[in-house]
Amino acid sequence: MAVFRSGLLVLTTPLASLVPRLAPILTSAARLVNHTLYVHLQPGMNLGGPAQPQSSPVQATFEVIDFITHLYAGADLHRHLDVRILLTNIRTKSFLPPLPSSVQNLAHPPEVVLTDFQTLDGSQYNPVKQQLERYATSCYSCCPQLSSVLLYPDYGPGMLPVQPLDVPLPSTIRPASPVARSAKQPVRGHQRGAVGGTFDRLHNAHKVLLSVACILAQEQLVVGVADKDLLKSKLLPELLQPYTERVEHLSEFLVDIKPSLSFDLIPLLDPYGPAGSDPSLEFLVVSEETYRGGMAVNRFRLENGLEELTLYQIQLLKDLNPKENEEDKVSSSSFRQQMLGNLLRPPHKRPELPPGCYVIGLTGISGSGKSSVAQRLKGLGAYVIDSDQLGHRSYAPGGPAYQPVVEAFGTDILHKDGTINRKVLGSRVFGNKKQLKILTDIVWPVIAKLAREEVDQAVAEGKRVCVIDAAVLLEAGWQNMVHEVWTVVIPETEAVRRIVERDGLSEAAAQSRLQSQMSGQQLVDQSHVVLSTLWEPHVTQRQVEKAWALLQKRISEAPSDP
């Protein structure tokens, strides 16, 4: 059967019976849709009757919200799918205006409409499919040539008949003051509320948080998106999506799921944000992790003469397949870890480089562990060129940079034996941009020439991959000598600790050294592959092996020699 880029899944089974069926339903849908799957909830709708079904309001109860969590949790097994549960027809008891008569536009108009509704004979019965297509197009903007499929998932022998759940689902949402509730208890609506987060690589746990906030809010939802100082403590912050990109994805998702709401997406620059100062806000949605932050917001409001916000705490989604060193919850941090070793952007085409040898430029801030990664790559078969060693060669008496450097900086930079005292030379140029440029204008072209000669040597030895290990790779403009730039990153605090331990410098001196270099973010912005030595050595080894295996695949699949 054809695979569609976008689809609409209409769920008609009563919620209590639907929860145990979710996994096979989502698996069936994931075989047909490969990008965006919208989900429309209409429990009890009959597509087999004589009358054309109409969309009707679904009251927002704790059962509905818990079901939304179950669905997004199940969708996490199909991460290629961008699942979006549409909330237009889900209403709180206190706000039940009529459903909009116009068709709702969607960012990715469905090419196929699917349903869990089943005919008695298990066939693709045309009248039912026609009802389904008419229903879908009456609610949402769909592609002109809309297809329809009745899903008949394999529920397994032990699953049917399905018994209603007598025990409420685990609570997804908890008000700050716990109250006894039943699954059928309506959720209270509010006019205006807020939610905040980083929202990097919008995932299913984010979608639960945002969906609950959208159900609670009836007029406006303020969404604080963490930026600047609030990002510094994040794991692998260099791999965070830019603020504008995160906001763009957020906005599309929010407008898709509840276009009747007004959304105010603003940068979150401190822990309180608008929730701490806006008197018109009534509630704040937090996660288990950020609940204490929500309490702090309320204390801040009270101190400033504002009423407390009603806090709604959302459970975290468990990651069903966490890898070593990853969190056991669905999180952006884990997704960023999974990016390590992957190709982030297309390689450079370098027809001017020697054919038959693929050249990697390896860089990273001081203390990043770049050289240890180079040795791991060497162990896998790469020919490694150490630019520091080339620098030593160029400075040595008789070396290509020796005489020009002495002429530029004088003989007082020499040891008694005539060799260049690099410590004295370093003190001359450190903090003096003019003097540093004089030195780099002499040395960098020489090192680049020596590196090219080393690449030629690698080709002569039959090496397929050559790695240029260079801290100044990008500052020196040597990216034009490589097909890919690989960067090793670690937090600056860890880099300082390593430099102090390795080189015997003070923390201030170590920080000064780092400030004189390109930042990890600047390096990553121009990189094709990112690695990190933050964890145990065997974790780094696995990263390098993954990156190496993917590199070999790229080389073998290349249409011609690089």
From Swiss-Prot:
| Source organism, top-level taxon | Eukaryota
Amino-acid positions noted as binding ATP in the UniProt annotation, renumbered to this chain: 364-371
The UniProt transmembrane annotation reads none
Q: Which UniProt keywords apply?
A: ATP-binding, Coenzyme A biosynthesis, Cytoplasm, Kinase, Mitochondrion, Multifunctional enzyme, Nucleotide-binding, Nucleotidyltransferase, Phosphoprotein, Transferase
Subunit details for this protein? Monomer.
Q: What does this protein do?
A: Bifunctional enzyme that catalyzes the fourth and fifth sequential steps of CoA biosynthetic pathway. The fourth reaction is catalyzed by the phosphopantetheine adenylyltransferase, coded by the coaD domain; the fifth reaction is catalyzed by the dephospho-CoA kinase, coded by the coaE domain. May act as a point of CoA biosynthesis regulation.
- Please identify the protein, giving its name as recorded: Bifunctional coenzyme A synthase
The gene for this chain is: COASY
